[in-house]
Amino acid sequence: LNIGTVCPEPAEGMLTTVAWDLGDGHPTYALEGAIFVTGAAVQWLRDGLGIISESSEVGPLAESVPDSGGVYVVPAFTGLGSPWWDPYARGTIVGITRGTTKAHIARAVVDAMVYQTRDAIEAMTRAGGVQLTELRVDGGASVMNAMVQRQANELGVPVLRPTDHETTALGAAYLAGLAEGVWGSVDEIGQMWTLDQRFEPQATDDSHAQWLRAVERSRQWESADTVVD
């Protein structure tokens, strides 16, 4: 979350970082919400459980069911990041019944990405004293239209996906170009951003409240005495 040129006081559950520094003596700061596991949970479905053979299969499998069937996966394989910062949390699957299928588990893993993003963004906006008006997404998971739509539903704001899905690498290239004079300003670079698809928020349900219950069950699972580096 871009918070301008004044370095903020540390906020509970958030990291303070430098968003960029153009060498003009006025770095731009940001609040960062750290989510430890997102795409790695899809890899776990593939390599650990054998539910899918390719990561690209998770989207169609997750969308083959209307919802997770009450299943929640908290992928706290290495603890929980923002806003909980709980190194003793561990991965949890709750809500399993005899009717649970691999599709429900895949759906719950995809939904966990949505819920974790909502939790981090809500903590960031509280800490920054701002209101979110839209979210721009990128990365491999952003190609899943249904997931991005659910993200818009959970946040209650439009979610915008650019034509270039790997904007982290693109941003590094832009900064290098600024340093070498390829572009004259950040504003000039901003005008190069192009929209692929805009997802407008629709009605959501109370599943996030259930997700928070699942998170509580994952927390403090280990103790300081049993955690081994």
Predicted segments, located by residue:
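Minor-groove-contacting beta-hairpin "wing" of winged helix-turn-helix DNA-binding domains
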Residues: 1
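Glycine/Thr-rich phosphate-binding loops that ligate phosphate moieties of nucleotide
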Residues: 4-229
